[in-house]
Amino acid sequence: MRNKICEELNKSDIGKVVNLCGWVDRRRDHGGVIFIDLRDHSGFMQITINPEDGETLFKQAEILRNETVIMVNGIVNERPKDSINKNILTGELELKVKDLQILNQIKNNLPFPISVHDYENTKEELRLKYRYLDLRRGKLLKNLKTRHKIIKAVREYLDNSGFTEVETPLLTKSTPEGARDFLVPARLSNGEFFALPQSPQLFKQLLMVGGLDKYYQIAKCFRDEDLRADRQPEFTQLDIEMSFISEEEIISFNEKLIKNVWKNVLNINFNEEFPRMTWQEAMDNYGTDRPDTRYEMLLKNLGGILGNIGFNIFTKAIQNGGAIKSITIKDGNTSISNVRIKPGGDIFKVAQDAGAGGLAFIRVKGDELETIGAIKNNLNKDHISTILKITEAKDGDLILLGAGNTQIVNQSLDRVRQYIAKDLKLIEKDKWNFLWVTDFPMFEMNEEEKRFEALHHPFCSPKNIKLEDSKELKEKIESSTAHAYDLVLNGLELGGGSLRIHQAEMQREVLRTVGLTDNQINEKFGFLIEALEMGAPPHGGIAFGVDRITMLILGEDSIRETIAFPKNQQAKCLLTNAPSNVSKSQLKELDIEITIDE
């Protein structure tokens, strides 16, 4: 049908006869000559139709509506100098049409404009419902092509490094991995269910037991969890696993892989090694294990000085094993008013939404500190000097403080830090601050259930523990750090991985530590334990979020802008109306009966 696409055309094609296909982006009638911007997946080409080219042809052109699908045949001409459009690649050319065929009309008015000339800020719900039209606008198509380029660069690099791409099952066993599983009823096994995988974790470990050595997969994963801008119920993961490998070797290899992606897609070179930070350093200085290092405002520990001044809130925080921390906003006295940091203010609310009871503040004015009387009246000159030294605050700076449970203090000051950095435009948008976070704790305490939970997952290998330490194995595991590592970029986790447990008894003990009985271990993970008993090699790996990497490379705010057909924040597909009801006969085949609480 066509022998060229729009943006393939250049001055060397002048005088040639070509066939083009696409959509009418817009039609203009200027003094009897009809101009049409023809759009295809590559871009635009202006086509012209004159009355002298034939009455039938001209009448066809007169009735064309935007988004009509057409095929045109004509001669490529150079545009007059006064009509050159420098905004498109073919802006110096036009096609003088000799023949026009309408391939498809549009039946109804469009729900929103497609042409860049009529572009409007369409509501996302409408864009998701008519995703095929949203794709036609061009921006999303470019995003999908960039995504393809990223995956292509990954595949080429891994293929050249001796990796084998292997597909693992999508219908698998439900195992406790943190989020809820999506369950699939098994018709041939009454009352039993498959689960869609939250990750290929166990299968890739079994591939290492099988001797594959180097594996990767562009894997679909599924998690039934609450959604936000950078999460979807189904998402794409770059999954990597290697045998006979150390933590240092995994980090080094994957750093080169990521650098290669940025070079291939954005033509950006990173010559320096990515910096590293332990989990404890990240929590102490940023309040999060995903620190954004593009700006300052580090958290400072003031518990040693403020916990003893006699202010009740501070005293209780330290007595209860909590923390008193601060962040310093340079020139905050002029940029942030009291209204914003007091109850009802936007910054106060950010801290409150993160679980904090509130915020205390200190304004530095010369050598004096301005704050509420209950704090100020208990500060002497030594206190003031120490506070200024620890916080590195100067005249005109604002110090914000959080006190209480350490986790809540960290979480609230981290959120406030991010909020203020955006508000005061402290973030360099074009900066790529990669960071490896290492030495994660093996476990964290679930305070509600009073039990340990794996911080990453229960297959991470603990550091500096050997099976020979059997008498102290349980105690050592509970307090150990893991051979675990995350790659963070600009405050978002790109990927995470670990060395895996390859000894069956160590794996049993870790699963016991997270609260599983031996019977539960055998029921849920018996196949893995059995495999580890049959000569499993030391192995480890990592998984990267493809959607999130694409989002960051494109500079988008949501991964929905990187996925062809995403779900909304209620996990619904507005295009197909999924999930939906199914027929009674389908449910009967599965022996499922649905009851809905009134």
UniProtKB/Swiss-Prot annotation:
PROSITE patterns: AA_TRNA_LIGASE_II (PS50862). L-aspartate binds at E177, R223, H456, R500. It is found in: Cytoplasm. It is an enzyme of class 6 (ligase). Its EC number is 6.1.1.23. Keywords: Aminoacyl-tRNA synthetase, ATP-binding, Cytoplasm, Ligase, Nucleotide-binding, Protein biosynthesis. Residues 201-204 are annotated as: Aspartate. Its main location: cytoplasm. The record marks H30 as: Important for tRNA non-discrimination. One of its GO terms (cellular component) is cytoplasm. It catalyses: tRNA(Asx) + L-aspartate + ATP = L-aspartyl-tRNA(Asx) + AMP + diphosphate. GO terms for molecular function: aspartate-tRNA ligase activity; aspartate-tRNA(Asn) ligase activity; ATP binding; nucleic acid binding. One of its GO terms (biological process) is aspartyl-tRNA aminoacylation. Homodimer. Aspartyl-tRNA synthetase with relaxed tRNA specificity since it is able to aspartylate not only its cognate tRNA(Asp) but also tRNA(Asn). Reaction proceeds in two steps: L-aspartate is first activated by ATP to form Asp-AMP and then transferred to the acceptor end of tRNA(Asp/Asn). Belongs to the class-II aminoacyl-tRNA synthetase family. Type 1 subfamily. This is Aspartate--tRNA(Asp/Asn) ligase.
